[in-house]
């Protein structure tokens, strides 16, 4: 058995020398499936590595103290706390700008007082600690940050790069465990670079070291700080789902190529069996062939996936930073298990795609192998099985939907993806039976039109070879329509929401201690119609009381205070109230609160429920008057009237929205404010600028989604093109007799295009309702479970028309090259094809 295997393998592979198009089709499917999946996983692996490094440093390992009034802490306050024996440590945080304009986070610490459990403190040896603490000090950074400083890794140790403002960093020391785009140095060196004087950003301590905050400070426990990995989990799950979809579409190409190759090698397999090769040996050799080709395609795909990840990583990093404040390195950091996992997934997909082919080849006996129609003879039974499989997939989708209806709105993210996957599978399995039914009806209608009747019958013969490519096209079209409609609806909702929230033409952000003076000054300005003061603080949601039960939670939340003035309340959107908008705002003025949709979804809250909130030294019981949308915020938020928030939680001011009279001179007011209170250039922001920044963030957020959607559609087009190219020779053999009977080549070429265009049009018709169902699943289930907000369902007729047009155009483009080859074929070549019949 093993002695003859090399000869049998060489014989099987010789088929691809005669049919290189099929080999290209098979490798193409493996390549694109592996490339898109590996690219997504490379992005996810790099992001999670960045999160792990950030978590190990400070964010979730230290309790944090800040001043209750929002004013900056000072070294004197820190020294006073140390003198009382409290185990606290100072921290200074700011930003520096490199010469290429990149902003890096600079953190100054005192490692002598920092908790010994912290990752940085553990990394210091006595020698390195001395260098870290004394001039010229050290700058510790991850290798990812070197590119922003314009320094090669080999030249980094000991280098002192110059920043955009001309200042020089202390000598560099590489620390791979640090998060990306972060510089760590002694607090004295950081104070010089940031020119912070006596101010520090916060005071920290080991988790649980202090039972309560010292007087005048607020305490945020390490356990209450959400990690970047927790906040971004749903984002990465969405990316994984898109990568998995592209992987499945790529496997359709592989499946089609394997089936076509086996059909065309039936005579070869018969000969090998007659020569004494056993069925088991043949299947083992076919498996070895699959493994060899799979390794080639998978390795090429993984290499391409890394290139794709490098291309998309900057946009993903910008999105995660904008949405979640999560820093992600700009360089790929791939562990060994990424490479092994990518290879395993690619080969596993090949086994999945090839198992059916191997099983059917093993079951064909020698007599059947001699029949060239043996493969096609079972297709009618396959259509029946596809119909039954589609019905089963639809039943699973309906069962998941029924189960989701019984769950709280924020649960069921994985089940939601399962529901969409089941709908895609059901539709894909039903497509070939639907096409077969349409062709059967057309054959009956065209029985008196010989050429059209032949074209329909010919399409029925092509259907077994084209069905997988059409299924891939259906999935890609429906996904494009579904995701495109979701993004378009989100854009409309988001822009409308911005218009409702941003009612003031000018917004002021100033140091907390200046707000009282600024507010008093603005009260005397004739051009100011209304001042909308906002406040921010943090609290813990301890318990929720509903008519049915009381629940203990301990959930950290944001507190946000607004001024319910005449300019704001008519526009502020509310999703749910107990007794109407007017009653909700009246209750809000008297101390009731609104909760954002994220918190209401996560904790199953509704108007009328009571909340018990606590903060250091404060405990309040409040009633919910309404639920409001809060797109883009990953955290739960409780909204209060600004005076109520100041009185109950001593929250400092955070901004003032200035509503002006129509004839106000905005430029003069800006200049007067800036001069009077010595404000920085970024203290005043107009409404248009805020909207522009928000819209840029929105567009950047969906850049990778659009890219993956386009790539998935391109993969489906390649699947169809590869299927047509691989069978181009057999198609010429089928068309040559018609040419010999007098049908012009141009007419046959156009007829071939019409066949594919019609099949693609039917596929596009099925993709439209499927795309609408996907849009519904995304806005009603996936978004609610992943982000906490539900979007309105928008349908775009133009998008549907584009879907139909795209289906036809993709099919025509895929069929154009084979049709052109036939059109240009010489009469001698066509006569030779006819003679072979």
Task: List where the protein language model places each region.
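Membrane transport/envelope proteins' first extracytoplasmic loop
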Residues: 2-251, 260-263, 279, 314, ...
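Juxtamembrane segments of multi-pass membrane proteins
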Residues: 65-70, 427-581, 597, 609
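Small-residue-rich transmembrane alpha-helices
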Residues: 255-258, 292-324, 337-363, 391-405, ...
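Short cytosolic juxtamembrane segments of multi-pass membrane proteins
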Residues: 363-379, 823-837
